[in-house]
């Protein structure tokens, strides 16, 4: 009966997955609370202490005026104005910054440090995202498919000798390593140099960006004390698009590479067992020891499907 099948589905698959999902969220909440709550309390106490010291040094101000000034600073920050800057700082809405913002909209990163403040800008952002997000998905699909075409040679496994399979695994690992260096290692080094961050902060920004989490605590090109080249944020937006396509390519290839390494390991074990069972004899052409592990294209649907399917 349908109700029995529904209960079986919930009991067999959905319920364990739901429990694992909730437990993972609870674990993350607990660890984040332990790591960050004390630092937040220290920062809050330090801020209150600095306000009291400021009022002691400037007795012409009272607590109410101070709170009003802090409120003005917060409103300016929400609207994308850095309180450390002045009127001579570059605009947050010049073409390069606007291009960077458009990229964060269609990629759904949404740092949160900058957003439209006018009603017309907010309405346009809604319709721009409605069209831009599907367009971004289609673009990344086709870009990832083009990148995947370069892996066609190392994704054909049928009737290949063992030495060729080893070379294919090494080639795939080299491809992933070089791509990771170009996308996830070198850009954080550049960001660290330009922004004055540590490498760990640059890598954190790169991962948070390319995973489309986009907290907004680290954003390139926003420090008013630095002089950036005019195309700096535009180049960062292009890096984001290429990085998203790269991650969409390698995320399915990670399990694939692990699976192929396991296949090679099983192949070595079977050939070793075959050699011990019949020393001095070559295995028959159709035997299991001669064939090793049979791998068909159906085992790797990634080579025949488009990105994101």
Swiss-Prot record:
Organism: Homo sapiens
Protein name: Potassium channel subfamily K member 16
Gene name as annotated: KCNK16
Induction (UniProt): Down-regulated when pancreatic islets are exposed to a cytokine mixture of TNF, IL1B and IFNG.
Binding-site positions, K(+) 2: 109-110, 213-214
Cellular component annotations (GO), alphabetically ordered: endoplasmic reticulum membrane; mitochondrial inner membrane; monoatomic ion channel complex; plasma membrane
Tissue specificity of this protein: Highly expressed in pancreas, in both endocrine (alpha, beta, gamma, delta, and epsilon) and exocrine (acinar and ductal) cells. Expressed in pacreatic beta-cells (at protein level). Expressed in pacreatic delta-cells (at protein level). Not detectable in the other tissues tested.
Region (Selectivity filter 2): 212-217
Location of region: Selectivity filter 1: 108-113
Result of altering residue 110 to E: Acts as a dominant negative when it assembles with wild-type KCNK16, KCNK17 and KCNK5 subunits, disrupting the channel K(+) selectivity filter and abolishing K(+) flux. Results in enhanced Ca(2+) levels in the ER stores
Binding-site residues, K(+) 3: 110-111, 214-215
Keyword Mitochondrion tagged: yes
């Amino acid at each position: 009966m349908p109700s029995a099948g529904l209960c079986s589905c919930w009991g067999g698959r959905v319920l364990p997955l739901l429990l694992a999902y909730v437990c993972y969220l609870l674990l993350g909440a607990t660890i984040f609370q332990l790591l960050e709550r004390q630092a937040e309390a220290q920062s809050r106490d330090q801020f209150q202490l600095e306000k009291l010291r400021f009022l002691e040094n400037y007795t012409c101000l009272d607590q109410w005026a101070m709170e009003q000034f802090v409120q003005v600073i917060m409103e300016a920050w929400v609207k994308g104005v850095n309180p450390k800057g002045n009127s001579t700082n570059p605009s947050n809405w010049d073409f390069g910054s606007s291009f960077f913002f458009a990229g964060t909209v269609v990629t759904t990163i949404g740092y949160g440090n900058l957003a439209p403040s006018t009603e017309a800008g907010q309405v346009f952002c809604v319709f721009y995202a409605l069209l831009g997000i599907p367009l971004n998905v289609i673009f990344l699909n086709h870009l990832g498919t083009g990148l995947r075409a370069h892996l066609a040679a190392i994704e054909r496994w049928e009737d290949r000798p063992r030495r060729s399979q080893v070379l294919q695994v090494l080639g795939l690992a080299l491809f992933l390593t070089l791509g990771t260096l170009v996308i996830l290692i070198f850009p954080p080094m550049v960001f660290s140099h330009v922004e004055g961050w540590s490498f760990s902060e640059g890598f954190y920004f790169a991962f948070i960006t390319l995973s489309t989490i986009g907290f907004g605590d680290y954003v390139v090109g926003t420090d008013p004390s630095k002089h950036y080249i005019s195309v700096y944020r535009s180049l960062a937006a292009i890096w984001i698009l290429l990085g998203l396509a790269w991650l969409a390519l390698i995320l399915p290839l990670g399990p694939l590479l692990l699976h192929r390494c396991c296949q090679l390991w099983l192949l070595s074990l079977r050939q070793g067992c075959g050699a011990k069972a019949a020393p001095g004899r070559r295995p028959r052409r159709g035997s299991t020891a001669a064939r090793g592990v049979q791998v068909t294209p159906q085992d790797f649907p990634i080579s025949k499907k488009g990105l994101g399917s």
